[in-house]
Amino acid sequence: MKQIIFISIFIFWDYLCFGATTFVNTDSLQRRISLFGTMLPQEKVYLHLDNTCYFVGDTIWYKGYVTRSDKGTLTDMSKILYVELLTPDGFLVERQQLEMPNGTANGAFVLTDSLYAGYYELRAYTRWMLNFGQYEHPHAQWSEDAFYNKEMAKDFFRDYEKLYSRVFPVYDKPKETGHYTKDMTLRPLRRYFKARKGKPELELKFYPEGGNLVAGTDCNVALELNTEEGEHLENVEIDILDPQGRKITKTRTGNRGRCTFLLNNVGTQEEYKAVFQYKGYDYEVKLPEVEEEGIALKVRQDTLLRIELQRSEGLTDFPEGLALQVMAQGVPQTLQHIDFGDKRKTNVTIPLNELRTGVNQITVFDGKGQIYADRLCFVNRHDYDSARIDIHGIEPQYEPFAPITLNLKLQDIQDTATSVSLAVRDRATEEQTYDN
């Protein structure tokens, strides 16, 4: 009965938002998107851990904060926080359900001696978050045959991209109390998986700025090169060839196997490809197909968010209007109307004080709801740069079991914060890579 009621409400909501008219202008769409983000706000979880790495036998202490997207405050919607600890193999160690009366909760996981070293994962979510970002892990069709029925396979491969997830190292239990060495005895996975011989399998992904390669435009393209196991490959030179095999540009992978290159005047119905060498083997990967009509984006940020738009040659008429919207955490921040006129390029500048610090989504769409370009960008207003709490009283060295007194002072006296989540740890075993 609950499912029937929910479906009926969803259909009625969909009719209110999109069923009144077949085509609506961009202002009306923006208002409805804003209403959707307000009426159905999303939640976001953050866990503050007491350390950056652990040893078998330790206890993981944590505090969880859950905010709502429309207000940017602690949530008052969900009352239960689910926190899961998973082994390096992906098996569930424990799931905790914590009462969350004011948007916060705290708990702990004990790394018992029966566990083993490796890279563990913490996941946290509310039931409300499971309504957003659901997807299915890519897998081969034959892998579903290992399950009794399709429903079991569907449950196994289902995941949610909106969940909080953090991976951290767990090292072997110290042989002597107090002598911590970062030794990690991994399980012998090689008895299950044998390394392939011959040509390594590599994964080269392309990310055109704006989402597509658009004919007749200058397109920025980012790429990422990884091994089959997910290792980032750095300092690999990659040549970009046109359909005739001529080299038109080149690039070299940098940090985390990533880099960018520019394709000038992208040809219609042309197939570009990337060629490179790795460990003496030759590789050739096709770039995404070229779209005949569309809009290319170039986004830059200094004191302003600067966006350059370039349309394809044949894309001239937008009877329902064209607009650019920036959205953060599911809530629209600003809307700019776009008018190319007789030109193929135009620019939009947005003051940073109109946006939120964090990941923002730029979308170019018309009054019919058709999306021409879509891109994520990180906006930094520097409102989180400086520490807001001064800590005094830390000595360079302490005697065993000596009492420690710390003085904490809030810098901004007008700040309304009433509580602090504080973690104290041994700096000798700190792991900066896995810091909060």
Question: What residue spans do the PLM features occupy?
Answer:
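Beta-strand-rich structural segments
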Residues: E43-K71, L204-E231, T303-R311, T363, ...
